[in-house]
Curated annotation (Swiss-Prot):
InterPro entries named in the record: Ribosomal_bL28, Ribosomal_bL28/bL31-like_sf, Ribosomal_bL28_bact-type, Ribosomal_bL28_sf
Gene: rpmB
GO CC aspect terms: ribonucleoprotein complex; ribosome
One BP annotation, GO: translation
PANTHER family, alphabetized: 39S RIBOSOMAL PROTEIN L28, MITOCHONDRIAL, LARGE RIBOSOMAL SUBUNIT PROTEIN BL28M
Protein name per the record: Large ribosomal subunit protein bL28
Lineage of source species: Bacteria, Pseudomonadati, Chlorobiota, Chlorobiia, Chlorobiales
Amino acid sequence: MSKVCLLTGKRPIYGNTVSHANNHVRTRFEPNLHTKRIWIEEEKRFVKVKLSAKAMTIIAKTGTATLAKLLK
């Protein structure tokens, strides 16, 4: 699986790490992804998905209905 959040679409971005001496080094910034088993009440089953920390907050606030719409 790729390093992409299913709900928010966050993916790695590229940029520079800049030191105190202003040296620029190219780097890849990874999203804060976690693999979770989420119970989808509408389908009565568990779904294993990769979610960012922000997506887990969205699911906690709005419920799994938003995730169920994406999986259909």
